[in-house]
Amino acid sequence: MIRTVIKYFFSLLLLVSIAHANLNAQNLTGIWRGNFITESFDHYKFEIQIKQNGSSVSGVSYSYLSTIFYGKATLTGVFNKSGQNALIKEIRTVELKMAGNQGACIMKCIFQYEKSGNEEFLEGTFTSKYEKDGNGVKKGGNCGGGKVYLRKVTTSDFYIEPFLRNKVNPVKTPV
């Protein structure tokens, strides 16, 4: 009887240890693509390419609608493994194409990491602020917020950053 209890206890301890190791082994490095929806229900495509080093993340983001709007920004952030959440902030835009003289906005995203089968997701909220003064807007002024939905993918709609090369599949070109 005691041997059975001890075997059961050690089996349970082993399962808990394996589950805990898998949780702590989570790595966000890769390409995450989806969209963000503003408070006024405008939909934009959104892709981030990130590299995780410990709890720190860095990389680039792409916000795009069509040929009318496209922006690329550098980003930094932190991933809390125990809470399975991430805070990611765009630092500055490095490429920008916009119609008119609208001001560019940089985003701050708060994500929750979820896994369902083999699929991985980052979902959460964002706030944004104007990056520069101009056209009636002040640097740091409120650009609005909304919701963000991303799924980890193996290909990019854009140039794959050097820090991700050999870690993901290249963009597939039509034949």
Regions found by a protein language model. Name each.
Residues Q26-P174:
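Central antiparallel beta-sheet cores of small beta-barrel/beta-sandwich binding domains
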